[in-house]
């Protein structure tokens, strides 16, 4: 297993950081903050999709746009580590892209739902850190959706029903953050990621580091 990322002289394998939440709980905002923070050094996983490219989107930057036939080939050959169908379009993550990034010590952020998180944890459990964001109350969640002023009352009600179902999946995740205050929640998630980066089993370079440390002659 190639490991090329080095921190404090110790090589480390990359992470797949999965963040999920019901609509309105704060996932997208926190994901954006993580990606914009240069100290976190996270990159967004770029999915393949069969969806039509929008005028503002760039192939290879926002998504890799492919045909349904090509997607089916990738899926059937187990070249996707997770995939889902959303509103009639297919989305997925290329296994090869993820494995190259992990071996290079790169940490990737996955903004996906519980189904995608399930697939990642089943296929690459040692590399996944999963975080589920909860609202403090359902009333607060509804108020946040209302404040968006993007959806009709009917759509908001549907989102709330979906949220109740999604929240039931919280037990599948490694970490749970109750997002009552954005700043505190963001700080908590940064702490989770930084702690996971220091785990012994993610840092195979520690063996050589400790061996060298013990062989050192402090008098030299």
UniProtKB/Swiss-Prot annotation:
GO molecular function: ATP binding; guanylate kinase activity
Name of the encoding gene: gmk
Family: Belongs to the guanylate kinase family.
Keywords, in A-Z order: ATP-binding, Cytoplasm, Kinase, Nucleotide-binding, Transferase
NCBIfam families hit by this protein: guanyl_kin (TIGR03263)
Listed CDD domains: GMPK (cd00071)
Role played: Essential for recycling GMP and indirectly, cGMP.
Residues of the Guanylate kinase-like domain: 14-194
Catalytic activity: GMP + ATP = GDP + ADP
Residues that bind ATP: 21-28
Short name of one Pfam family: Guanylate_kin
Location of the protein in the cell: Cytoplasm
Organism from which the protein derives: Brucella abortus (strain 2308)
InterPro entries the record matches: GK/Ca_channel_bsu, Guanylate_kin-like_dom, Guanylate_kinase, Guanylate_kinase_CS, P-loop_NTPase
UniProt GO cellular component terms: cytosol
EC number of this enzyme: 2.7.4.8
Keyword Cell division: no
The protein, known as: Guanylate kinase
This protein's record includes keyword ATP-binding: yes
